[in-house]
Amino acid sequence: MQTKYVPILKWKAGEQNCLKKLSPTVSNAIIPFIEVSTPSESSKDEDAEKKYSKLIHSFNSILPEKPFYLYLTENWYNDLDDANKIPETYKIFLEDIDHPQAIPAFELTDELNISNAPNLRNENGICLRISINSFEHLGEILEQYRNNSWITPE
């Protein structure tokens, strides 16, 4: 069945439970766009590791064999002292979840991550999130990305 709907989810427990309860017909008609925030801050390192581990494993338990768009929110990058570490953060997260159907998603204007997308070892392509603010420049941005060989439209 063709994709008919792309729900934008914050990956909260209620949303995860709803995805598990969808009928196969409905489930096959959607590809979730998941905005992932960092697990809540914890004063204990082991608590933070447990939360991260739970987050990592949730994708394969909730969405086994199902494609989804994976978007890391800005709070993943807030503590980085070097912007060049941003693509590495995304790469590590994608490797940690180890989901064969994950499709990395980036803001259309996120040149740093888009230019580094070939390093993600991902065979599913990427998703470009287009906001209303970048819509009027869509054509020129995509042309620039194509000229730089950052994207290959299909």
Question: Can you describe what each PLM-predicted range is?
Answer:
Residues M1-E111:
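Alpha/beta catalytic barrel-like cores
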